[in-house]
């Protein structure tokens, strides 16, 4: 989470970050109810995201972040439109056997669990089961999109999915090692993401 916040603060070109969780983790949105999250998923470590959205169980998902500078049209578009554009790209990255489509939002019911509440432009299968969702946050620097796809995958599938998503979202792209300044990340963890008070604040 600290790396994602740093990416939003320093973004000058679009960045797609794909990562795995070490251990058993759940996350909740910036405005989520911590006690409700604990009732939904037991015996996990928790972190509060910098974005909105519901409760996500990261024990069995594929997690990515897409950060877009404010110089890009999609970063300045309304929330629903940026969500649609990014998830349209995600459709192309997912296995076609899943028959993924974008949700029209008609099944949204206000459930706190992300994958039980398909909102408009979430990725769902042919019968409406949610396959992918995300939370977003905007700043003067750009747009932070933190996404989760249901179901874990091995490294080969993850790399292929990452490359397909990058190709769907960009005319040109390349791979680079992401090396955030350790002291900056440590300070963000100490000030926010590593604090029990931050995680449990609502």
Residue ranges and their predicted role:
Residues 1-41, 48-49, 55, 170-202:
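Active-site loop/lid in soluble adenylation, ligation, and acyl-transfer enzymes
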Residues 6, 89-97, 164-172:
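Generic non-transmembrane alpha-helical segments
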Residues 38, 73-79, 155-161:
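Short, conserved charged micro-motifs
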Residues 50-73, 145:
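Residues forming anionic-ligand binding surfaces in small-molecule and nucleic-acid pockets
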Residues 63-110:
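Contiguous, small/hydrophobic- and glycine-enriched helical/loop subdomains that border
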Residues 95, 99-156:
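A contiguous pocket-lining binding segment that forms or flanks enzyme active sites
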Residues 124-125, 137-202:
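C-terminal accessory segment of soluble enzyme catalytic cores
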């Amino acid at each position: 989470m600290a790396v994602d916040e740093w990416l939003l603060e320093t973004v000058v070109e679009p960045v797609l970050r794909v990562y795995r969780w070490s251990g058993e983790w759940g996350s909740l949105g910036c405005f989520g109810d911590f006690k409700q999250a604990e009732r939904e998923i037991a015996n996990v470590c928790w972190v509060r995201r910098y974005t909105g959205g519901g409760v996500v169980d990261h024990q069995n998902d594929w997690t990515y972040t897409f950060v877009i500078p404010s110089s890009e049209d999609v970063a300045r578009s309304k929330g629903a439109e940026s969500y649609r554009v990014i998830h349209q790209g995600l459709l192309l990255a997912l296995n076609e056997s899943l028959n993924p489509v974008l949700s029209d939002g008609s099944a949204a019911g206000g459930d706190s669990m992300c994958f039980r509440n398909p909102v408009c432009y979430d990725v769902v299968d042919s019968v409406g089961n949610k396959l992918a969702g995300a939370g977003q946050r905007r700043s003067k620097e750009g747009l932070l999109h933190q996404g989760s796809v249901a179901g874990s995958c091995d490294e080969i599938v993850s790399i292929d999915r990452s490359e397909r998503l990058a190709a769907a979202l960009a005319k040109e792209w390349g791979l680079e090692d992401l090396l955030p300044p350790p002291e900056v990340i440590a300070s963000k963890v100490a000030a926010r993401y590593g604090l029990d008070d931050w995680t449990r604040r609502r």
